[in-house]
Amino acid sequence: MTSHYVIAIFALMSSCLATAGPEPGALCELSPVSASHPVQALMESFTVLSGCASRGTTGLPQEVHVLNLRTAGQGPGQLQREVTLHLNPISSVHIHHKSVVFLLNSPHPLVWHLKTERLATGVSRLFLVSEGSVVQFSSANFSLTAETEERNFPHGNEHLLNWARKEYGAVTSFTELKIARNIYIKVGEDQVFPPKCNIGKNFLSLNYLAEYLQPKAAEGCVMSSQPQNEEVHIIELITPNSNPYSAFQVDITIDIRPSQEDLEVVKNLILILKCKKSVNWVIKSFDVKGSLKIIAPNSIGFGKESERSMTMTKSIRDDIPSTQGNLVKWALDNGYSPITSYTMAPVANRFHLRLENNAEEMGDEEVHTIPPELRILLDPGALPALQNPPIRGGEGQNGGLPFPFPDISRRVWNEEGEDGLPRPKDPVIPSIQLFPGLREPEEVQGSVDIALSVKCDNEKMIVAVEKDSFQASGYSGMDVTLLDPTCKAKMNGTHFVLESPLNGCGTRPRWSALDGVVYYNSIVIQVPALGDSSGWPDGYEDLESGDNGFPGDMDEGDASLFTRPEIVVFNCSLQQVRNPSSFQEQPHGNITFNMELYNTDLFLVPSQGVFSVPENGHVYVEVSVTKAEQELGFAIQTCFISPYSNPDRMSHYTIIENICPKDESVKFYSPKRVHFPIPQADMDKKRFSFVFKPVFNTSLLFLQCELTLCTKMEKHPQKLPKCVPPDEACTSLDASIIWAMMQNKKTFTKPLAVIHHEAESKEKGPSMKEPNPISPPIFHGLDTLTVMGIAFAAFVIGALLTGALWYIYSHTGETAGRQQVPTSPPASENSSAAHSIGSTQSTPCSSSSTA
């Protein structure tokens, strides 16, 4: 009997131990994270100290770009020794062909790692560096025509600028910045630049930026220290910034890489992300293969195709709790175990997850993680000449292509933008972007350097590609098409020739700021698939349509899923297209829209370049349309502020929506309508202002405004909607009118540089004893027509006054000649008067008055 009780008690104790075992939450004590913690929290920003840009080198044989680096304030043992310099052309230049001179001045010797995109090979480039510094080139072809020389540069910005001008005649750009790991410079000359480079303190330009990552304090714990083939990481973010308007969505980047460079890690990851604020998690993985599942209550996005080395899926769960204990319990209850780490950050906008490699299990992991049909694609030795270079610019060992392999459709739509229109750059070798989902510039390798020429007229666009450039890039047996795969290339002895009508083969039009049309299409280089393509990645049923390169509308047997197409975007511009039938966005002839920003409500001088606005400061906006038809009008359909330059990505910070003001600070002004005495010059203006609220955790924002045509008549032959005033639009605008407005819209984008109050107080703090600088005078003036009217009236008044005086004087002289004896004034007064008149008047009547 006793033995039965002992057995029962022993079984009860065993069951208690078994149930208590998997609860590791009690074993995890939060502590400040160290460098060994797998997850690090950071705050990312972009800035420069001062600088300038000019078009002064346009007529010279080379561009001249000056970088003047300042110490970042580290101790002697923490000096940064390496800088990565990213070079690519400005947005208006597709491939940069001009010679360039770089003056790279640094306070101590540096190793400059050069990363280039869309810079033509065979062009002379000279790098002048400080004594002891060296330049390392990522491309052997680029280094063949590049030279490096050491120089003893002068100190100080102005001295260095004058030295460069004396040596080379002019300077294209001058940038002063603190030493950063990544510096992004766009080469090229833009005619909108000023003629001379004058250094300014508040120099803000997307062409010249440095990236700074500041570590942020975080707490966490590691619950499983041994590397596993499957890991679960929990990240909890309290707030993405300290801004009181943090209800607006902010991008939070999760960067996943191996803990050591030159290694490729195979993992199955589960990330549980939690933030009470409205954020968008942007997931990017490099050099890590396997599957990745993201679970979060917020929106989730993935990086570009080159930033997704893993098979990514996402799951939106609204029941994810907060705090460490609840999160760990929720993960275990939902079967996500074993939990590897938990991290909590009070403030951050970027997280780095670094993974260890369990080398002893790596061989088996590949078998279980990747379907057998695709294993051959991960073997670098089995690949043809078309390979994707390593993401890290060539120093990595991962010669194989990242998994999974995107198809043509996904790559095109991912890199073109949500509207299907290509961004004004080459997606294969992207330019620097600080925009939607890509708030920071990102390096992308694997560019295709081909020689092409584009011609277009009012009916078609023709692009010719040299065959030799394909062979030089290692391509053979490829299929060359436009975006529409039915539009195949024709071959002659030397070129591939592709022809597209302006409204076919995937060609998309977009109106440029110069009232012309830019037509976009892409060359798709498709290499035949390797082996069988019947297999699908594990867990494909969980993928959303279009996620990670598997579009929902493609058949399983499509061989393009298992080849890596290269996409080369090209465009062709037509100025003042006269055939409105080929492009229906501008059916009303000679119409010009414009938008300008001003600093005051006088609307005198528009702001040039990036508009600087302080927190809670006023922004004054003027939009106008110049047209020939007086019955045509326009309306401000939508205005919003966004961290994205792409106007098709909407934002919660709306100023005007469907003509109706949504922000309580919007104030409209009543400018006079301008009528010019020449045809096609009738201008309507609309002016408004609003108070800028700091709702985003970034210093660079974009004001997006959509203008739409309307008619002042009851009915318009081209079915334009009737113009509606803002107060009426807030109550009586129906869906049919909104749809009609969307068919004739023009979008303008203006960059805004946010000036934070904290930065202003820090700058003003040390100079309290100095007298306040005299603020620049504000000249209150009138518009041109009013001034012309006043001048004309003054001229008429002056002419009438002169005639009246002449009449009085001439008649007074004749009377004096007829009078023989003066009666009233004495003789002394008459002689004085006659002398005065004779001395001041030189007219023919002067002699008669004294006769």
Curated annotation (Swiss-Prot):
The protein's name: Transforming growth factor beta receptor type 3
Cited Pfam families: Zona_pellucida, ZP-N
Post-translational modification: Extensively modified by glycosaminoglycan groups (GAG).
PANTHER family: ENDOGLIN/TGF-BETA RECEPTOR TYPE III, TRANSFORMING GROWTH FACTOR BETA RECEPTOR TYPE 3
Membrane topology classification: Single-pass type I membrane protein
Main location, first listed in the record: membrane
Annotated ranges, domain ZP: 455-730
Gene Ontology cellular component terms for the protein in this record: basolateral plasma membrane; cell surface; cytosol; external side of plasma membrane; extracellular exosome; extracellular region; extracellular space; inhibin-betaglycan-ActRII complex
Modified residues (Phosphothreonine): T840
Swiss-Prot/TrEMBL GO biological process terms: animal organ regeneration; BMP signaling pathway; cardiac epithelial to mesenchymal transition; cardiac muscle cell proliferation; cell migration; definitive erythrocyte differentiation; definitive hemopoiesis; epicardium-derived cardiac fibroblast cell development
Glycosylation sites: N141, N492, S534, S545, N571, N590, N697
Residues that span the membrane, as ranges: 788-809
Cytoplasmic side: 810-851
Lineage, highest ranks first: Eukaryota, Metazoa, Chordata, Craniata, Vertebrata
Residue ranges, annotated region (Interaction with TGF-beta ligand): 737-751
Extracellular side: 21-787
Coiled-coil features, chain-numbered ranges: none
Record keywords, A-Z: Cell membrane, Disulfide bond, Extracellular matrix, Glycoprotein, Membrane, Phosphoprotein, Proteoglycan, Receptor, Secreted, Signal, Transmembrane, Transmembrane helix
Description of how the protein assembles with itself and partners: Forms homodimers and homooligomers. Interacts with DYNLT4. Interacts with integrin ITGA5:ITGB1; this interaction promotes the internalization and trafficking of ITGA5:ITGB1 into endocytic vesicles. Interacts with TGFB1, BMP2, BMP5, BMP7 or GDF5 and inhibin A via the ligand binding domains. Interacts with ALK3/BMPR1A; this interaction results in the cell surface retention of BMPR1A. Interacts with ALK6/BMPR1B; this interaction enhances BMPR1B-mediated stimulation of the BMP signaling pathway.
